[in-house]
Amino acid sequence: MSSWASFIFLFIFSFLTSFRVFAQDPTYRYHSCPNTTIFSRDSAYFSNLQTLLSFLSSPDASSSYSSGFRNDAVGTFPDRVTGLFDCRGDLPPEVCHNCVAFAVKDTLIRCPNERDVTLFYDECTLRYSNLVVTSALDPTYVYHVCPSWATFPRSSTYMTNLITLLSTLSSPSASYSTGFQNATAGKHPDRVTGLFNCRGDVSPEVCRRCVSFAVNETSTRCPIEKEVTLYYDQCTLRYSNRNILSTSNTNGGIILANSQNMTSNEQARFKDLVLTTMNQATIAAANSSKRFDARSANFTTLHSLYTLVQCTHDLTRQDCLSCLQQIINQLPTEKIGGQFIVPSCSSRFELCLFYNQSAVTTPQPQQNSAPPPPPTSIPSPRPGLNSRFPLITCLSAVSFEKFKDLLKPGFICILIKIVSENTGKGGNSSVIIIAVVVSITALLLLFVAVFSVRTKRRKKMIGAIPLLNVKRKDTEVTEPLAENGDSITTAGSLQFDFKAIVAATNNFLPINKLGQGGFGEVYKGTFPSGVQVAVKRLSKTSGQGEREFENEVVVVAKLQHRNLVRLLGYCLEGEEKILVYEFVHNKSLDYFLFDTTMKRQLDWTRRYKIIGGIARGILYLHQDSRLTIIHRDLKAGNILLDADMNPKVADFGMARIFGMDQTEANTRRVVGTYGYMAPEYAMYGQFSMKSDVYSFGVLVFEIISGMKNSSLYQMDDSVSNLVTYTWRLWSNGSQLDLVDPSFGDNYQTHDITRCIHIALLCVQEDVDDRPNMSAIVQMLTTSSIVLAVPKQPGFFFRGRHEQVGEVGSSVDRLALCSIDDASITSVAPR
């Protein structure tokens, strides 16, 4: 071992044996706060909620943090609020307290006005509601679907039959031991059919408790809807006025994904293992009388993959196979865990044990004929339900032949073992693990310092071009790219060699050209490995490109989402400035949407899916990524479609990163595309998340109609842009006239009307009236949410006979400019 290695080893060993406690923010997993019941900040409910959260997070509750659980209630009906926290059983009191305190602060950011809230972290769960939630054994709510197109009055025969049905399903004599029961009550047209299906690994008592809880919640979540599906982690409850028995249904489901990505070099192998194991489980479940299977498979020497699949018992073998195969192919296998739940079947995979292994007969982890590949560094799996899983695991054994070997997981493994032996059986494993994390960080800092010096020397020796910030050459007053001062040197992207890009694109051969914009040209490239990429080459004559180039690298390098285009790297060599993206097989949305022939490939089902995908991508930018990012140039030309017509938001050259507490910003440099710009941005340079919401609303109008917002539309002797035209149709009750004629009769009237309604809420003139993206996604996925009445949109075109109030010339000019479809780089300051 070298002297350097010896020094580092002794330093880490001393650090580990002396270090005791280190606080860190809990790891966020998921939250649920349906906005079907909300409160105002000046209400008695909010006052009671503040008191409750203060009780739950109080440092005085030391005994509760020791036990890991506390529940409480504040106020009287109807403003009574009850809540609880539940910490993971292996955590010390101080970590439990830290998680609860963090969750209490986080809840009013993630769920600012919702009454029924659950926040999940790796270390704890926080829950509160206007309902009774004082039991730690309450089932974990996941999602519900209850379309509002079929409802019943409270005093109807259907209501009586529903009460009878729910009483039967939740009775003490129900079939909880088998985990499934169906029943029917009443006669047509008031017949109601229902069923419950419990997860195959839960006990009869857990099944009974889940079904009973779900039955009680139907009156709150879906009080007057005839067709209802409630999903919980332990069971599903369904009922309808239609026959739902022995019929496969894959509509109205939800995909949940772990926030951590599988490392890129392991994604292909991990996906193959997930699909292989899931397919084996699918066959076993279809052949099982319980229509259930759970099994595991080795991923690395110290990590196993755990999978679970299930169908409702009433499905035939073939229907079960078909249902599971359909949803398995849509699982988010780029993540280290995920699930897809639909009414008739469900599937889930994790890198940690999330089901009751003792309750299922599951095959041993599969052994390959060849030894498993050497383990590589992958994200530490997050614990699932009913599991005890280490936060850090030893991944491989390594030699100390080179200094950099000290960074490999095998060295971490040795250190963990040494410290574990020193602490004895009574040692605190959580403290040890946290100490290891801190020690590794210290080691990384030393490693970076040493190799920075060595790298600089090597670059000087071989004449390599260092990574430099892209500087503007003019003296124009500019705005910062990001509030945290990020630059291209800290983006963390891979820098490509220019010669490799030239070879991949055949020296930028015109036949490989995919398109051209204000930034420059985009080419298709193929590397020797067969990997296809999209190469975006900055035009040397572009006045705006240098700034946008750096901005795009800084922003996109930090993003990972299935509905965002992925940046693979960049190239800086001489005057060449190039971005390398994943190759998206189809072109942009406008290529299909506004072409009379190509638009026929986008039926309503696909367009509805595209709307939802775009919404989820923007939600990730605004809320779910570790940064808050405002796109500022959302339009059909910046939405790419992959081989399956899934949308990917692209072109982040205009994007801005917000600070943690920042909600809006001002700029003198208005960039983007008129027609998609929100009024406050185009006129005053004020932009926020609500600016993107406005652009999203315009985009939805274009997707539904297949028409450009920049065109002019005649109606009642008036000339309108698409936004105003839609508003007039809505006001006249003829909103379906907006629908693209290429659909024919193949569309859902309710879905299209709801999408138009949501889009009108997005384009309202007052910023505060527009919903945020989280609410929009919930509106799109939960038809039971009641929508507000939309107000007049911004940039409203009035008819010649309408009264026009006095407005400034700047507003008049911008209203006319809003029909221009050109990309704008700057306008005169106002």
From Swiss-Prot:
Residues exposed to the Extracellular side: 24-430
GO cellular component, as recorded: membrane
Transmembrane segments: 431-451
Stored SMART domains: S_TKc (SM00220)
Domain Protein kinase: 508-787
Keywords attached to this entry: ATP-binding, Glycoprotein, Kinase, Membrane, Nucleotide-binding, Phosphoprotein, Receptor, Repeat, Serine/threonine-protein kinase, Signal, Transferase, Transmembrane, Transmembrane helix
Ranges of residues in domain Gnk2-homologous: 27-133, 140-244, 250-354
Region (Disordered): 363-382
Modified residues (Phosphotyrosine): Y581, Y681
Protein name: Putative cysteine-rich receptor-like protein kinase 23
